[in-house]
Amino acid sequence: NLFQFARMINGKLGAFSV
């Protein structure tokens, strides 16, 4: 699912952001 993939990327970016 594209949405799931996007969520995974967003989660990784969020972790890096923190």
Swiss-Prot record:
Binding partners and assembly: Monomer.
Subcellular location: Secreted
Domain of life: Eukaryota
Biological classification of the source: Eukaryota, Metazoa, Chordata, Craniata, Vertebrata
Cofactor: binding comment: Binds 1 Ca(2+) ion.
One Gene Ontology CC term in the entry: extracellular region
Enzymatic class: hydrolase
E.C. numbers: 3.1.1.4
Its biological purpose: Snake venom phospholipase A2 (PLA2) that has several activities. It exhibits anticoagulant activities (by inhibiting activated coagulation factor X (F10)), it shows hemolytic and cytotoxic activities (cytotoxic concentration(50)=65.8 nM), and inhibits cell migration in human skin melanoma cells (IC(50)=25.6 nM). In addition, it reduces tumor lung colonization of B16F10 melanoma cells in BALB/c mice by 65%. PLA2 catalyzes the calcium-dependent hydrolysis of the 2-acyl groups in 3-sn-phosphoglycerides.
Annotated keywords: Blood coagulation cascade inhibiting toxin, Calcium, Disulfide bond, Hemostasis impairing toxin, Hydrolase, Lipid degradation, Lipid metabolism, Metal-binding, Secreted, Toxin
Biological processes annotated in GO: lipid catabolic process
Expressed in which tissues: Expressed by the venom gland.
Name of the featured protein: Acidic phospholipase A2 Drs-PLA2
Family statement drawn from the similarity comment of this UniProt entry: Belongs to the phospholipase A2 family. Group II subfamily.
Cofactor: Ca(2+)
Keyword NAD: no
GO molecular function: metal ion binding; phospholipase A2 activity; toxin activity
Catalytic reaction annotation: a 1,2-diacyl-sn-glycero-3-phosphocholine + H2O = a 1-acyl-sn-glycero-3-phosphocholine + a fatty acid + H(+)
